[in-house]
UniProtKB/Swiss-Prot annotation:
Gene Ontology terms describing biological process: maturation of 5.8S rRNA; maturation of LSU-rRNA
Transmembrane stretches, start-end: none
Modified residues (Phosphoserine): S197, S200, S229, S232
Protein name: Protein MAK16 homolog
Gene: MAK16
Taxonomy, superkingdom: Eukaryota
Taxonomic lineage: Eukaryota, Metazoa, Chordata, Craniata, Vertebrata
PANTHER family for this protein: MAINTENANCE OF KILLER 16 MAK16 PROTEIN-RELATED, PROTEIN MAK16 HOMOLOG
Amino acid sequence: MQSDDVIWDTLGNKQFCSFKIRTKTQSFCRNEYSLTGLCNRSSCPLANSQYATIKEEKGQCYLYMKVIERAAFPRRLWERVRLSKNYEKALEQIDENLIYWPRFIRHKCKQRFTKITQYLIRIRKLTLKRQRKLVPLSKKVERREKRREEKALIAAQLDNAIEKELLERLKQDTYGDIYNFPIHAFDKALEQQEAESDSSDTEEKDDDDDDEEDVGKREFVEDGEVDESDISDFEDMDKLDASSDEDQDGKSSSEEEEEKALSAKHKGKMPLRGPLQRKRAYVEIEYEQETEPVAKAKTT
């Protein structure tokens, strides 16, 4: 039979308790079912056969109750009741389940439930709040990011310098008043361009008309207008033709002599000694030029 006074005298005063922690001023209890965390007679979960406490598991609160009737069954020693997430309903559940428990235990259970609810709300707020997260980076990635930042900074400085320089040039009229170009001067330039294009078109039309007028007209040209260089070219061409004819005649005569020698050899006659004499063909070319005085007709 269980006796709470005997257990407390044994654990609390004389012998050793594995859940007890002593300090200079006070003793604490490390048992997971401890209601207040203090080591005293009313808060000890081992020395009280009728006991209750509140525990939190994965964001959900549970009410644990112990009675003396289940002391002989350690497997069924604690009864667990799930509490509502609504604070008022949870307090009502505590009152309903702890009707026959001491008032001290009922009050401490409500106090413990209130503290657990407060830190759960605090946890939810912190999770929803934006927080800094430290991410470890390798040295290689860190160097790469640093180089990229330096290049981006240089590019930004260069763009700013270019923009500043362009603004200064614009203020100093370096580009010759590009944006404030006078309209009358622009119109004058357009008129000059149109006049030049019209004059060029008229000249082309006049040339075309002259060409059309010259069609069908006859002109007589004097014989003396032929250049001497053209005549010399014609003479050179005639000489080339004559030399080619001579070569062809010489080749034909040599072929005939060779054929005669071969035929004589077949007939049993001795071939002629010595080199064969080739005959050269002489060609005489005469040029006749007739000059007649012709009056040149000039048209106006």
